[in-house]
Design a protein with these regions (language model features):
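Short amphipathic alpha-helical segments, especially helix-boundary/capping motifs
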Residues: 1-2, 96-100, 107, 121, ...
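Small disulfide-bonded, cysteine-rich extracellular recognition modules and tandem repeats
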Residues: 2, 17, 49, 96-99, ...
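Axial heme c-ligation environment in periplasmic c-type cytochrome domains
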Residues: 8-15, 30-60, 69-70, 74-80, ...
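Active-site substrate-binding loop specific to GH73 endo-beta-N-acetylglucosaminidase modules
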Residues: 26-28
Length: 181
């Protein structure tokens, strides 16, 4: 329920994210590097849920399960200026996340081309306002915060709109209208 494309209060779709990244994030939740900031309610819920994962084998099985699934189509909801977003992505994101948003495992940088646009926008906002990556040992989070410095909320929307339109590996999910008579 929490990590699907069903539209309700939920977390991001995890399907298709790399196993190494999922395992690393689960370990961060388990250790308290993520999920302990009360201002970030969604992560706090995940931090609590991780108490049920008792062993490294369970954690690895979860990561393997989601990594083995195909990325899910989703309804694009973030709008922005694609040209501005492309320019910001090229100068602020591509060196770590790849020209096509594929990520770079050698520097522990996840792909952004499989994630839903609403979640990417939410995470950019949380990095910028200090709700994500507040743990001092989160080097990747510190890099993210620095990369976003000086950008506006509109710039975030433009970058995410560009990613969702030009880089995503999932086709858009069309809204379903009323049945034809």
């Amino acid at each position: 329920v929490c990590h699907s494309t069903r539209e309700m209060q939920r977390g991001p779709v995890l399907d298709g994210l790399p196993e190494w990244y999922l395992a690393e994030q689960l370990r961060n939740f388990k250790s308290g590097h993520r999920g302990k900031n009360p201002a970030n309610r969604a992560e706090a819920l995940m931090g609590t849920a991780m108490a049920k994962v008792e062993t490294e084998a369970q954690l690895a099985a979860l990561a393997r399960h989601f990594a083995g699934r195909k990325p899910q189509p989703y309804i694009r909801v973030v709008r922005g200026n694609i040209a501005i977003g492309r320019a910001h992505y090229a100068t602020r994101c591509a060196s770590c996340h790849g020209a096509k948003g594929e990520g770079k495992p050698e520097i522990k940088s996840p792909p952004v081309n499989v994630q839903e646009d609403w979640f990417l926008l939410d995470q950019l906002r949380k990095y910028a306002n200090g709700q994500r990556s507040v743990h001092p040992s989160d080097a990747g989070g510190l890099v993210m915060k620095a990369a976003l410095a000086g950008l506006s909320p509109g710039d975030f929307q433009n970058m995410v709109a560009y990613i969702a339109r030009d880089l995503t590996v999932t086709p858009p999910l069309q809204k379903v209208g009323p049945p034809k008579k």
